[in-house]
Regions:
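Autoinhibitory propeptides
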Residues: 1-49
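Short, well-structured alpha-helical segments in soluble
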Residues: 153-163
Length: 264
């Protein structure tokens, strides 16, 4: 793969001699070994809703009040894909992109991406109930994928984002620190896309992970219904905000009306 938007770079299998020659090339800024990134989220019960985020007070009022619907905004879900036929999406799922070589395209055979999309923009479970949802599939049915595949997804987002159109990208995934992945996210931000990324589920410093350590991304940690940091959530100076992330009810993929509860 060759990157031309998120990075000026490429993916290649190199011999030791080829690697040495590239390391000595003054035009090469950095070389990284491709690594594995994984989903941020585990299935838990019971669920709780949107009630917490529309008020500062921890005491919930059994209502989710909002002034904006996200209409006219593109939300790129960089994840496992989205089930476009789910009723909660109301036909607002675009064709998107896949970096995964399987028969699902930008559809979802894992469920995490659809759950995230439902949390972002589902009509019942979502925050922005009229946003346009665009699947960017970079993780497999097993919930993992190469860092280079994630960068390919970001590269596609940058290439297809229309200048002046409000857009956000969600990345509920992560791996070890990658300068290349962080640089790709930064390039996307510079292009006008707001990147919201998971702090991670390792109960460690978020600065030790990517894309959580990207300086200008909005890095989000997880809290439970008691407003305390979730036991699994990463923490530290790289975390910009905490939000509900324990036992979240959203879209499932077993049918066009199914639900699923996940944490992360």
């Amino acid at each position: 793969s060759v990157f031309s938007n998120a990075l000026n770079g490429f993916v290649a299998k190199l011999s030791d001699d080829e690697l040495l020659r590239l390391q000595k090339d003054a035009d090469v800024v950095a070389i990284e070994q491709d690594t594995l990134v994984v989903l941020q989220g585990d299935q838990l019960n019971p669920p709780w809703g949107l009630d917490r985020i529309d008020q500062r007070d921890v005491l919930r009022d059994s209502r989710y009040s909002y002034n904006e619907t996200g209409a006219g905004v593109s939300a790129y879900i960089i994840d496992t894909g989205i089930l476009p036929t789910h009723s909660d999406f109301g036909g607002r799922v675009g064709s998107g992109f896949t970096a995964i070589s399987d028969s699902y395209g930008s559809g979802d055979c894992h469920g995490h991406g659809s759950h995230v999309a439902g949390t972002v923009g589902g009509s019942t479970y979502g925050v922005a109930k009229a946003v346009s949802l665009i699947p960017v599939s970079v993780l497999s049915c097993a919930g993992s994928g190469a860092t280079s595949g994630v960068i390919r997804g970001i590269d596609w987002v940058i290439a297809h984002h229309e200048s002046g159109v409000p857009a956000v990208a969600n990345m509920s995934l992560g791996g070890g620190v990658s300068a290349s992945l962080n640089a790709a996210v930064t390039r996307g931000i510079d292009d006008g896309v707001v990147f919201v990324v998971a702090a991670g589920n390792n109960n460690r410093l978020a600065c030790s992970y990517s894309p959580a350590s990207t300086p200008n991304a909005i890095t989000v940690g997880a809290t439970g219904s008691n407003d305390a940091r979730a036991s699994f959530s990463n923490y530290g100076s790289c975390v910009d905000v905490f939000a509900p992330g324990v036992s979240i009810l959203s879209v499932g993929i077993t049918s066009s009306s199914s639900t699923r509860t996940m944490s992360g």
